[in-house]
Amino acid sequence: MIPQVVTNETITTISPNGINFPQKDESQPTQQRQDSLKKHLKAEIKVIVAIQIMCAVTVLALGIILASVPPVPYFNSVFSVLLKSGYPFIGALFFIASGILSIITERKSTKPLVDASLTLNILSVSFAFVGIIIISVSLAGLHPASEQCKQSKELSLIEHDYYQPFYNSDRSECAVTKSILTGALSVMLIISVLELGLALLSAMLWLREGVLTSLRM
């Protein structure tokens, strides 16, 4: 009869050829860790995608509003660069597309889809960065445009010898226009900064998912 030594519920068998230790299956804990990381990744992606799409819709809506307003003297040149760049439209569509593709990839994680999501998010980072620069330049140009508007109103009033009440009304018109544009562009700038952060985070998550997918293959 072969003697057995029992220690901590682990059976060690002593045979004439030596001591045989039982081999532990290390693949199961590794698989559990990968499954846990995958579940955590899916939860993070759902939250990021929801915020990303809402921000993109807001940028698109603000772009449509700015494009549909009637010509505003002295202020048109300020935000026309933003509209001509196409950022409120093309950038927003890229953000929405990357969000939708992230949802599809989260449900069916394959290497081509993961690579496509990573590429779209990298492009979204580029668009957000360019958008932040353009919006910042537009915001900086609002004050000079407002001053030109006020000076033009003053000259017009002097030439036509208008009364003081009309003068105050025209000056307030310039101030109100500046305030509205400042608010709209500031909201777009904040959302663009948020989109930049979300796109960077999404790119990092999909990069990690790509590594995990390669390990499983």
UniProtKB/Swiss-Prot annotation:
> Per the record, a Pfam family?
CD20
> Which is a Gene Ontology cellular component entry for this protein?
membrane
- Keyword Transmembrane helix present in the record's keywords: the answer is yes
Record key words, sorted: Membrane, Receptor, Transmembrane, Transmembrane helix
Tissue specificity: Expressed only by thymus, spleen, peripheral lymph node and bone marrow.
Q: Where is this region: Disordered?
A: 1-33
The record's subcellular location field reads: Membrane
Q: Which domain of life is it from?
A: Eukaryota
Please verify whether the record's keywords include Membrane: yes
Q: Which residues lie on this side of the membrane: Extracellular?
A: 68-84, 143-186
Q: Polar residues bias: where?
A: 1-20
Q: How does it sit in the membrane?
A: Multi-pass membrane protein
- Cytoplasmic compartment segments: 1-46, 106-121, 208-217
Stretches that traverse the bilayer: 47-67, 85-105, 122-142, 187-207
Function statement? May be involved in signal transduction as a component of a multimeric receptor complex.
Q: Name the family.
A: Belongs to the MS4A family.
| Protein name, per record | Membrane-spanning 4-domains subfamily A member 6C
Q: Which organism is it from?
A: Mus musculus
